[in-house]
Amino acid sequence: MDNLKEKPLSYNINNNNLNNNNNNNNNNNNNNNNINNNINNNNFKYVSFSESLEDIGYQNQYIIDKDEDYYIQEQRYIRQNNQSDDEEDFNNNNYEDSIKISLIQKSFIKNKKNKIIITTIVVLLMIAVSLGLILAWQGVFDQIHNNNNNSKDE
């Protein structure tokens, strides 16, 4: 009892805070151990901060341009649970390839509209030129025919 009287009130408060901190630290350590056990037991596939869920197996369908109605299905690389962790089975090159493919498809789609318009114009010009040539030759033949008739009449 004498010891309690000698100690100031703040001592008991500080002591309680220390005990609470120790309990919190123990709980945090237990939680971390559970997470590590899950990772080691393959219940949870570890994803680094540089990867997103899309990188490891999300299939995304999206519109390339808001003003166009073209959809491109971008297939991301999927790692199944039974596959090994070798670099050949899973790396970011597959993801980069899918991005490159979708960019090529995007430029192709944009060029496709332009190609159709240009092709239509070229075909119409060719038809006009061919009709012009036909009419010109027709005029030449008519003139020759008329000249022949005129020479016979004389």
Curated annotation (Swiss-Prot):
Regions that span the bilayer: 116-136
Glycosylation site list: 82, 149
Keywords: Glycoprotein, Membrane, Transmembrane, Transmembrane helix
GO cellular component: membrane
Membrane topology: Single-pass membrane protein
Domain of life: Eukaryota
Signal peptide: none
Main location as per UniProt: membrane
Stretches with biased composition (Low complexity): 12-37
Compartments, as annotated in UniProt: Membrane
Region spans: Disordered: 1-37
Protein name per Swiss-Prot or TrEMBL: Uncharacterized protein DDB_G0277605
Species the sequence originates in: Dictyostelium discoideum (Social amoeba)
